[in-house]
């Protein structure tokens, strides 16, 4: 299945996979250089007997060709609204990973009931370089402009997403077991980073230009304002700086939390059984009839 979405005069065609029957569940992968809707397939398979699921690629990401655009948080905020207003109206639940979780949380902070149940998997609000360096730096913008340029841009990008770099990134931040990213799975990830036009959204994510928020305080405030039940899931092996943000979110009253004994930023992909065991009881609960906060 392909979704069509118009953004600033350009029609974008985005990959989407549907499966199962029952209450509607929208699954949104992380925003990252190697992410696509396929990372949600293990959860889709486990949800299919009880739910009608749809997993969707983000604009600028996935394994298809992508146009050159100056991607911004406004685009992703608008895309979430498009999905919930025109594609999966009034879903029973939304399962979202990484930055996707925070974009959904941002949307729900101002939503009116009825609201879906929110499953936030290893949620992040700050890109890799700002996380590593403790904030934004002037050279981030220069790097984006450089990667956008023909000729040198693709060269710089390829040097940073070659096979060795992707495996190193996976072992360092994404997967608990370095051997998990091998064989067909590695080929799928390489297809994502090598898709025509992949560099434009990727470099903006890495440099923090797709960050939906500017501070932890705003991140936590969204959770307090969300008029929806929230379940937070993350792995104990999540990199410390990202884990600190998740632990702060876990301390917000009303946020239910499951910390899995294993797993990093893609815990749902690597440990789908444990993730599903955490999600299943939450999805079967009766939803409140009115906003709770």
Annotate the PLM regions.
Residues 18-63:
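Conserved HGGG/HGGXW glycine-rich cap/lid loop of the alpha/beta-hydrolase fold
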Residues 2-4, 8-18:
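A short loop-to-beta-strand scaffold at the N-terminal edge of the catalytic core in hydrolase folds
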Residues 157-224:
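Conserved alpha/beta-hydrolase catalytic His-Asp/Glu region
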Residues 101-112, 118:
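Short glycine-enriched nucleophile-adjacent loop
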Residues 224-263:
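Conserved loop-alpha-helix segment in the C-terminal half of the alpha/beta-hydrolase fold
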Residues 55-95, 99, 125:
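Active-site loop/oxyanion-hole signature of alpha/beta-hydrolase fold enzymes
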Residues 263-276:
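Catalytic histidine-centered segment of alpha/beta-hydrolase-like enzymes
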Residues 115-152:
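Flexible "cap/lid" loop of the alpha/beta hydrolase fold
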């Amino acid at each position: 299945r392909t979704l069509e979405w118009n953004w600033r005069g350009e029609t974008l065609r985005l990959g989407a996979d549907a499966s199962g029957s029952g209450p509607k569940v929208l699954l949104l992968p992380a925003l990252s250089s190697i992410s696509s809707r396929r990372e949600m397939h293990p959860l889709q398979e486990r949800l299919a007997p009880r739910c009608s699921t749809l997993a969707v690629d983000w604009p600028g990401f996935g394994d298809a060709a992508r146009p050159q655009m100056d991607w911004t948080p406004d685009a992703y905020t608008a895309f979430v609204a498009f999905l919930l207003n025109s594609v999966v109206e009034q879903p029973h639940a939304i399962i979202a990973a990484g930055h996707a979780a925070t974009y959904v949380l941002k949307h729900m902070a101002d939503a009116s009931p009825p609201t879906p149940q929110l499953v936030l998997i290893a949620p992040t609000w700050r890109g890799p370089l700002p996380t590593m360096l403790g904030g934004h730096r002037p050279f981030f913008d220069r790097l984006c402009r450089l990667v956008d340029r023909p000729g040198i841009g693709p060269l710089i990008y390829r040097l940073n997403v070659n096979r060795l770099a992707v495996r190193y990134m996976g072992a360092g931040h994404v997967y608990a077991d370095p051997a998990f990213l091998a064989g067909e799975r590695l080929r799928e990830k390489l297809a994502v980073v090598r898709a025509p036009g992949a560099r434009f959204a990727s470099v903006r994510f890495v440099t923090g230009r797709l960050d939906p928020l500017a501070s932890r305080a705003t991140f936590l405030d969204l959770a307090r304002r969300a008029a929806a039940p929230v379940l937070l899931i993350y792995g104990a092996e999540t990199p410390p700086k990202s884990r600190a943000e998740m632990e702060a979110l876990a301390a917000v009253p009303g946020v239910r939390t499951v910390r899995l004994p294993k797993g990093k930023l893609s815990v749902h992909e690597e440990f789908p059984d444990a993730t599903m065991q955490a999600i299943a009881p939450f999805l079967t609960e009766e939803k409140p009839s009115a906003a709770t906060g």
